[in-house]
Amino acid sequence: MASVALLRSFRRREVQMASVSAFKSVSANGKNSMFGKLGYLARPFCSRPVGNDVIGIDLGTTNSCVSVMEGKTARVIENAEGSRTTPSVVAMNQKGELLVGTPAKRQAVTNPTNTIFGSKRLIGRRFDDPQTQKEMKMVPYKIVKAPNGDAWVEANGQKFSPSQIGANVLTKMKETAEAYLGKSINKAVVTVPAYFNDAQRQATKDAGKIAGLDVQRIINEPTAAALSYGMNNKEGVIAVFDLGGGTFDVSILEISSGVFEVKATNGDTFLGGEDFDNTLLEYLVNEFKRSDNIDLTKDNLALQRLREAAEKAKIELSSTTQTEINLPFITADASGAKHLNITLTRSKFEGLVGKLIERTRSPCQNCLKDAGVTIKEVDEVLLVGGMTRVPKVQEIVSEIFGKSPCKGVNPDEAVAMGAAIQGGILRGDVKDLLLLDVVPLSLGIETLGAVFTKLIPRNTTIPTKKSQVFSTAADNQMQVGIKVLQGEREMAADNKVLGEFDLVGIPPAPRGMPQIEVTFDIDANGITTVSAKDKATGKEQNITIRSSGGLSDDEINRMVKEAELNAQKDQEKKQLIDLRNSADTTIYSVEKSLSEYREKIPAEIASEIETAVSDLRTAMAGEDVEDIKAKVEAANKAVSKIGEHMSKGSGSSGSDGSSGEGTSGTEQTPEAEFEEASGSRK
């Protein structure tokens, strides 16, 4: 964007230097003026060569970030707005236009019900999940039940899966990288919270597919941060404390001779900055209700303003001990307008969110226990995620691990950089590094008595494959149902159901006689395939775990087509914007020339130019590309008559057609300031 702005500033300066030769150029070849040279606008604006770069994307709950390897270093790429992180916000405005990132976040106050944020917390979740029900009470937009039972969102009357919302953000990250690299990108490494279950990982991969990305690897966020930290030959046992916008993860890793081995991981997929914001929001609502006896929860507009103020106050209190929350005209009643003005101290804030911060303690202790590592054996503690900037969080981390945390990595960027490094490893650009990750939760099946039988314990290094033989529970049983579960509870009903399938055609036999071999195969992305095989007949059935309830292949393909259609609409929109900008430049230069030479040209020429400019302005207000092109050309032809008139030596002819003092044949023709819309000068 900066380069575009710079280019436009140069074009404006050229307007002031254009000479009468520009008029001669137009009049000599009218057909090739303006749109003969702007034919590129009729083509898609992105016709870049396809590159084989693998970008790294941190798809965050609150913000997202994209990085790419430059040589041996990962570089974070700035977006079109010049920021290194992009809000994970998607909105549908009243015109039905899709907004992503900063533009979407800016309009949230006036369009709260159609602005989707924090959708990562819904990805791969069922509508009847208790966490989904909790989230429904905290957000202004609608969370609805999809036909397959998943939690979806609604904006402008349209229903979207969380994978689609994530895909819009991934597309924004993809376009950011393409603009920087100057070539098309279709490969990426995408990060997820370490404690994401299989369904959530699959849903994230689906989001990548919808965005037109071949997701080469799904990598855990703490592991990615450790890669970023350990690139410079650092070794030892490290703990990664990752408290982001929506999720909390902690991982213990050992780095030795370029091998990054995850010992254990733990976390909470519903603990993050959003919860801190909601707690503070609830406090502010209650304070205003106490002082003014008005419940702001019934006013979506006021609530969104308050939500943004709460987030801003939270950020400010990381660097100051007190902040003012001042929102004039927050609402009104019969007595008039009401203003909110509350002073919030850091100690009060810490008191409000104390229980949330304490919730990070238990996962850390469990992770240390699972890894078989003592506090003294941890060499370094890395802080990742924006919430780790909160002083109280840093204080708790010091208490848990018995040492001050390292602040050597950027908490907002380390994850994306680590993902880019993993992309470099997959491409072969980064050598002598090996990443050994783990499965965060135990996997198994339901067996007789509704018991959860684990085949793969949590923190098993992946990729991995394990088989176990089971049998029938009844005589002459000809089919068995395989219910795939993930979790740590003993009873099947208390764990997450990932999928179900049947193995049929088992020969009749007494109970306990048939041998059914169940195999779990987990790939490097942490995505599971389960198969069941009757060893007697060789019959086999398998299932690759989809997101809970799942997007079918047909649904994913439909969403891919919708995304492509949106991309086409975006191209057409950009074409129209570029065209309007060029037309605006033409109007500027034409009016400037007319202003300077009005007294030296006949009235009919001046009138023709004014009419052409007026027609062009009218066309610009519409969306007909061809009409704008035609009106620009008409304006160019009209203004070219100034040059024709001046070149005939009429000199200072007035608007009434009479001559003034005249000019000698040897006198230099005055310069007229005009520029072709293509920006070239002859």
Curated annotation (Swiss-Prot):
GO molecular function: ATP binding; ATP-dependent protein folding chaperone; unfolded protein binding; zinc ion binding
Pfam families: HSP70 (PF00012)
Subcellular location: Mitochondrion; Cytoplasm, Cytosol
Region annotated Disordered, chain positions: 640-682
Segment annotated as transit peptide: 1-46
Signal peptide: none
Keyword Isomerase: no
Residue ranges with Gly residues bias: 651-663
Subunit record text: Interacts with HSCB.
Name this protein carries in UniProt: Heat shock 70 kDa protein 9, mitochondrial
Organism from which the protein derives: Arabidopsis thaliana
